[in-house]
Every structure is written in C-alpha cells, then in structure tokens.
Amino acid sequence: MGQKINPNGLRLGIIRTWDSQWFVQDKEIPALIKEDYLIRELINNFSKKSAISQIEIQRLKEKTKNRIKIYIHTAKPGVIIGRDGDTRNKMVAKLKELTQKDVDLNILEVKNSEKIALLIAQNIAEQLENRMNFRHVQKMAIQKALKAGVKGIKTLVSGRLNGAEIARSEGNDEGRVPLHTLRADIDYASLQAYTTYGVLGVKVWIFHGEVLPGQTILDTRKPFVFTNNRNSKYPSRYFKGGPKNVNTKKN
C-alpha cells in the first residue's frame, strides 16, 4: 500500500498536519474547500516561477471569520514581494476580490530548497522542458539533495523519454526511502513537464528521518551527513557510477 498511495496523505494526522486549518459548521465545509482550492490556484498562477513549496491557509477564530491568514513558503521571496512590495500588494488585491474577505498575506523564505520535494520536482520539470537529458537532470538533483543533508531520495520520470516511440519510466534512488513506515518523514511531489514530444511525469520522494514520540517533522529535517570507511561526506558508491538506475516499462 505504501508504494502506491500518496505518502503525504497517508501520514496526515500521524506525523503531518493539514495545509488548511479552520473550524466551521458542516454546511460551510464545501464552500471553504472550494475557496481554498481557488486561492492556491490563483497564487500559483500569479507567480509561476517563484519556487513556492507550500501554501498554508488559516481561519482559526470565530471573531475573525471574515479574515484569512495565508502563509506562502517560497525559495524566492523577492519575486513575490516585488519592488517596494508592489507584486505582493497586487496579489492581495486579487485575493480580496476572489474571496470578498480581508486577507493577511505572509511571505516565508525557504532556506534549503534542495531538500524540498516540490521544489526539486519543479527544477527537474523546468530542465526537461529546456531539453536537458533526463538522466543527467535526475543525477544532479540527487547530488544536490545529498549535499543538503537528506537521508534518502528517489526520483522517477515517465513518458516519451528522449522522444522515444514507446513511453517508459526511468528513475534513480540513493539512500533509504521507507514508504511503508508511517513514522518516516517522507516528502513527496509529482508534476508534469510539457515538452515537444508530449507530457512527462516527474515524481520525487525524499526521506528526512523517523519522527519518534515527542518529536515533530521539524526535528527530522536537520542536515544528515553520509559517512563511509574513508571518512568521506558522501557514500563511496556515489563516486562509482553514481546512483542506482532503475528502468521499468510503462504499459
């Protein structure tokens, strides 16, 4: 089951929490779910190349029922804020027009973008659209993630690779990625890359560590250093041919 299901959804309520946090009556839930979807769609379309990794939406108090707090986690805060805050103000105006509510927009900078699955997937998809070799792109992404301190990473690209007539899937992995362990902090993302040969699917799994009792996922996302017998920072197998290569045909 752990190999098929979305790892983020499987761990909700166990070690992960929801990106939308609000408490309302049952009859209001469908409207707010739709509103959250439209808010995220507007933000992502408004700033497509701002490396957004997460959008949190909060409506926590009854007094502020008509007020929405939005937290945007991004690796490029300057792109969203703009010169003198112009871009941010335009986004707030569009959000107010969409929701007809007061919007409190907060921009949070992501420090280690090489450790976040969604940003890695965005980078891979962008390079594939620029006609980079899919094997080279995956190996470079894995190398950067290992340097950033992840405990394990797995990537997969599917579709007409290099313009082949038959679609297939090809991926790389390094380190541990225990998908069946519910306490394992797995960060997962999937995106599409639109190339001249068609649409390619990009998937990324990252293992940060196990969340033990009394810990949170923030405790597992501290940098991890690979070691081997030669006291090197990276595993010896990484320098001997690179990460493992896995080929599977797509039916």
Curated annotation (Swiss-Prot):
GO terms for molecular function: mRNA binding; rRNA binding; structural constituent of ribosome. The gene is rpsC. This is Small ribosomal subunit protein uS3. InterPro entries: KH_dom (IPR004087), KH_dom-like_a/b (IPR015946), KH_dom_type_2 (IPR004044), KH_sf_prok-type (IPR009019), Ribosomal_S3_C_sf (IPR036419), Ribosomal_uS3_bac-typ (IPR005704), Ribosomal_uS3_C (IPR001351), Ribosomal_uS3_CS (IPR018280). One of its GO terms (biological process) is translation. It comes from Phytoplasma sp. (strain STRAWB1). Binds the lower part of the 30S subunit head. Binds mRNA in the 70S ribosome, positioning it for translation. GO terms for cellular component: cytosolic small ribosomal subunit. Residues 39-111 form the KH type-2 domain. Part of the 30S ribosomal subunit. Forms a tight complex with proteins S10 and S14.
